[in-house]
Amino acid sequence: MSDAPHVSVLMPVRDAAPWLGEAAASVLAQDGVSLELIAVDDGSTDAGASMLAELAASDERVRLHATLDGARGIANALSLGLAMARGRWVARVDADDLMLAGRLAMQAAALDREPELFGVTCRVAAFPGAELRDGMREYLEWQNSLLTPCEIARDRFIESTALHPTWMMRTEALRALGGWRDADWAEDWDLLLRAMEAGLPIRRLPDTLLQWRVHPQQATRNDARYSEASMMRARAHFLARHLAPIRNGRPLWVLGAGPVGKALIKALTLEGIVAAGLVDVDERKIGGIVRGNGHAWRVIAHSQLRDMSPRPFAISAIAGAQARARVRTELARWSWQETEDFVVAA
């Protein structure tokens, strides 16, 4: 393949033989854009490597690479793929998912229409339904509801606001950002948080263009970097960087004295941020003391927070879609502005 393709599709592969053929076929069936499929084998121990070799022999659009010394992790595999990419745009797909018809063409057209965008994502349908747990269903519903760059940026501290295999990005902008890092937390959320921090907007198309396969072998279920503890470290790290220029010295309060709020207020201290305390509506918690990392924080009622002057800054750590809606409604009644006076992080 001599001419540079429009899109370079990066597919990291590790022990995905049961699904690899379907996933690759869904990429190669895309029309409306020229493409290359860059498959990086990350230490597979199944038949995946031989399947990839057969695929490359039968289709010149398939280019192969492999990580050195066995499994090195998805960030390393993606970095190798990015170094090989020749396309104007880089799209992501996992070796167990399915691209739906028209995805690449629709995302490329969106990037052409809006040159200010760093990337474009899309809505997702998960399958098979029997493997989809209630928490994951709620997570996907929340993600799919976020369409505009402002919504995606606003909610970024809750969890990753876009499934990684739905992304398409401008290749040079991705390289300028530093590509993927091998961090102590999920590489996809790390990339998204760095993009948001750099002011790089991402839009979600309202179309469902990826089928996300849910199964027990998924990295999200088995890799420690996707654990709750790792996510909290990432959240605290990027929140601390975000808060530094916008708090203007105002006291910081964490809304919610439950497990998430307690974990967050402790994690923030490791990033050099010591909050004033926690806020709750539960009479059993109000007046209590939370201790950790050499600090002690009191728990106050939300009415006490409302009456403070000058106005403090708050991080909401009350988990769940309904709880988020209640927090936003209540703080709007106080004339607090999201991002200026508070952020939502659960």
Region spans (language model):
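N-proximal low-complexity "stem/linker" segments adjacent to membrane-targeting elements
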Residues: M1-S26
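Short, acidic, metal-binding catalytic loop of nucleotide-sugar glycosyltransferases
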Residues: A25-S34
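A conserved acidic beta->alpha catalytic loop
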Residues: D41-S50, A71, D94
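Glycine-rich, basic loop-to-helix element that forms the pyrophosphate-binding segment
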Residues: T67-A85, M106
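Conserved nucleotide-sugar donor-binding catalytic segment
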Residues: I74, A83, Y139, N144-D223
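Short aromatic/hydrophobic "clamp" motif used to bind/position activated sugar donors
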Residues: V90
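Conserved donor NDP-sugar-binding/catalytic core segment of glycosyltransferases
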Residues: G102-R137
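Hydrophobic, well-ordered beta-alpha structural blocks that scaffold small-molecule cofactor pockets
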Residues: F157, Q211-A346
